[in-house]
């Protein structure tokens, strides 16, 4: 998914201009702008600032959007690795039609603690906040009471 490219494409469309005109006005090739809009290239800081200036956007908005997208993609990829490992360990034998999308974060964390090794467990801290992991650990894993 390329949200930043789609957003820039929408800005261009809503401005009533063509990609070639916008590219010319900000001093880049039409091909480079097209690569950014289609997600084939990332924005450089310099180019993000030029596009933000052209469309009167706050400084850093596009670059921040791109960074957030990169972080989300990274987290999704890490979660996919853990989910695949959990399936290989048959952690979901009692679940019906389980998928990465319909598994709660709490169940995901709990099963990771139960079925996977320390290297895999450490990946949880790249996906979720420490306090949330600790809460799930206390509520679902640690034996309470007698």
Where are these regions (language model features)?
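A short, Lys/Arg-rich alpha-helix, primarily the initiator
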Residues: 1-16
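Residue-level signal for the short linker/turn that defines the boundary of a DNA-recognition helix
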Residues: 16-18, 46
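Short alpha-helical "recognition helix" segments of helix-turn-helix
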Residues: 19-24, 33, 51
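Recognition helix of helix-turn-helix/homeodomain-like DNA-binding domains
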Residues: 28-43
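DNA major-groove recognition helix of helix-turn-helix/homeodomain DNA-binding modules
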Residues: 46-61
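Short, charged recognition helix plus adjacent turn
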Residues: 63-92
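Mid-protein regulatory/catalytic core that forms ligand/cofactor-binding pockets
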Residues: 89, 101-146
């Amino acid at each position: 998914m390329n949200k930043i490219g789609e957003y820039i494409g929408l800005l261009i469309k809503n401005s009533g201009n063509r990609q070639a005109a916008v590219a010319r006005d900000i001093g880049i090739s039409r091909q480079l702008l097209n690569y950014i809009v289609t997600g084939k290239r990332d924005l450089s800081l310099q180019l993000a600032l030029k596009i933000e200036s052209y469309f009167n956007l706050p400084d850093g908005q596009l670059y921040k959007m791109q960074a957030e997208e990169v972080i989300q993609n990274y987290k999704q990829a890490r979660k996919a690795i853990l989910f695949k490992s959990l399936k290989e360990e048959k952690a979901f034998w009692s679940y019906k039609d389980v998928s990465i999308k319909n598994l709660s974060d709490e169940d995901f964390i709990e099963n990771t603690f139960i079925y996977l090794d320390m290297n895999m467990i450490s990946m949880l801290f790249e996906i979720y906040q420490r306090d949330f992991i600790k809460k799930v650990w206390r509520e679902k894993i640690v034996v309470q009471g007698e």
